[in-house]
Every structure is written in structure tokens, then in C-alpha cells.
Amino acid sequence: MLTRRQATSIFGATALASIGGLDVVPSRARAADPTPADLAMPGPLGDVWLGSQDAKCTIIEYASMTCSHCAAFHRDTWPKLKATYIDTGKVHFTLREFPLDPLAAAGFMLARCAGDDKYYAMIDLLFDKQNDWAFVKKPVDALAALTKQAGFTQKSFEECLKNQEIRAGVEAVRSRAGTILGVDATPTFFINGKRYDGEMSFEAMDKIIAPIVNS
């Protein structure tokens, strides 16, 4: 069992309390849209892509697992976006980690440990059940119970969260996004290199994507 002391050393004390829906980090001057080369560079763990790499439209989302706006996007917009544009090969999509707190980092670590083929299934599960683990008195215990639905055992859960290589990889993506790409809030989207901040409806995204894919 992961003791409270061990959990604190992994996540930090903040993650063991009830964590609110933080969705911003300390503000800085808004950066210009990044260069294609800067935006294309993956983190140490690599990107997990969905859709066709030959698509005319590429979307990169930066999200945090404890961000309520991110969860709302994945609940309300993501299913239709995926069915309409990603599954049909019109959009190439990846989600990159931008954890706003240690518990969010833990969620991303578990998604990485699930493997590339189950990465988005884990992301969807954690967003769908966000209120059941992110904002409760014992979030680590709740997270452990939830991930059993994805095939984790208590042992594999603990081993994943002690994996410093994965932890460092997740944090590297967040750090680079903040310093190089100017990301300072979640969710943040880059659609063909142009930045859009905040939760987006399908209708808002459709107005941007449709002219690109139909050109």
C-alpha cells in the first residue's frame, strides 16, 4: 500500500488535499505563436497521435488532468470532434501534458504507464471521472481504485507513480510548453500553429477546422 508519507514524497502535500479546478499558472506576457519547428518537437516520452499524419489540419492540445475546463472539453466537445475529424483522417491530433499540480502529473503518469494504445482510454477515464478522484479528501486512494478499471493493480499503480523517468518526462513537456511556447493556461490549443486559449465548443472549432480541411 502507498502510505501517506510515500504519497507526499511523490505528489507533494497539495495533492493529498482536496484540489480545486485550477486552470492557470502565474501570468506572463503573451508569447507570439511559436515556430512550426518549436511546436513540432515532442517531449522525452514522445507524442501519442490520433488521426492521419497526412491530414491538412493538426491540433495540439495542452491540458491538465485536474482542470475542470479540460474535463468539460473532453466531455462536451471531444467525442464529436474525434468522430467528425480525427477518425475520418481529416485532423491529426495529440494531447500534451501540462499538469497544474502534482495530482494532475500523477494522472498523466498513469496514462503513460498504460501504454500508447491505451493512453487516450486512460485520459478519457480520468476526465470522465474527474470529480470522483481529483476533488476528494483522499485523491490518491480514489485514483488507485479508479485505475483498477484500466487494468492496474495496486503494485503496478505504485510502481508507475515511483517511475522517475516518466515523471521527469511529463514535467519536461510542461516546462517546455511554458518557456518556449508560452502556454500558461489549460486547455490551450494549437490548430495548424495558431494558438487558442480556453475550452472550445465543437461549433467554434468547426469554424476553424472546416476551411482548412476543405481547402
Roles of regions detected by a PLM:
Residues 2-6, 32, 64, 145-215:
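C-terminal cap of thioredoxin/glutaredoxin-like
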